[in-house]
Amino acid sequence: MPKLYVYGTDRQKTTKLTIAFARGVIRHNNATNGPWQVKHLPITNYLEIGFPSDLVAGQDAVATLGVLRGTGLMLKSAKAKGIDYYYMDHAYFMPGYGGKGWMRISKNSHTCTTLREVSKDKWNGFHKNYGYQCEKWKNNNQRGRDILVLPPTGAVSWFFDQGKEEWLDQTISELKSLLPESEHYRIKIRRKPKEPVVDAQGNLIELKTYPGSHSDIPFETQLLDALVVIAYNSMAALQATMQGIPVITSENSCCYRVSFNLDVYKNQHDPQEFDTEPPNRPHLLYLSLIHISEPTRPI
């Protein structure tokens, strides 16, 4: 019987969610979904002794929530050892830990990137009632001029084994090489307010703020002046594309399947490609319907 070790988070509220996940697996154990031998452990157990000696790669699995305070360290180790892992985090629609909501769960991936066809009528149900709308696609004349760049947080950069500013530096450098110097003023960098900064072990050091920066401006306000949003994996990219703004993301973004590419800036300052709506944009609704998302090959 395969084993599933579910680790807590060292925080009471989110540990309760990992316990609920473990209990859910036990409740639904059957020939199709398992059966799993499930055990819940505190994350300190992994930090002190590592994985249990009876954990077998290719057969058993681990699960946890988030990447801070040891959970990310555990997930990175699982990936390196070829151990399947289930990752939980905020949902893409109705995120948060309070009220009636849900969590996103992905297998062997930090992000849900699977999209499947979903009827547009679904937007008239739950999502419309909770304020979510898939707005009409805007053409270049209906959008602003800013190129809004959203770098990954320190915690995300650490989890993906990147230098703190590696993605940002590469993105800005490529943008400036594609645009004439007279257009560089359009590039606006927006960092996550209260950005989590971690040490080499993934432990939270601080929630960093950037007074006087573009981060102080409400994101909704910045979108009014944006031609495009370029993001590593920020959930703000989902908000942008739902409002008819094109996005350019990394493969670690939930919007990767509707993402444009920086190459569209070759020989043009306002890419005409942005006028065309990604045909699968309405299918982003699928991100709220799936139970387990597995990574798929790029289309």
Predicted features and spans:
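N-terminal pre-catalytic "stem/leader" segment of glycosyltransferase-like enzymes
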Residues: M1-A61, A155-V156
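Extended catalytic core of nucleotide-activated donor transferases of GT-like folds
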Residues: Q37-K100
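Donor nucleotide-activated moiety binding/catalytic core segment of transferases
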Residues: I49-L55, G70, R190-Q243
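Structural loop-to-beta junction motif characteristic of Rossmann-like glycosyltransferase folds
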Residues: I83, V228, G244-I248
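A nucleotide-sugar donor-handling region in carbohydrate enzymes
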Residues: M88-D161
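Catalytic phosphate/metal-binding cores of nucleic-acid and nucleotide-processing enzymes, i.e., regions
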Residues: G131-D146, N203-E206, Y210-F219, M235, ...
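Conserved catalytic-core segment of nucleotide-activated headgroup transferases in glycan assembly
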Residues: Q142-A200
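Single conserved hydrophobic/aromatic residue that forms the stacking wall/gate
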Residues: I290-I299
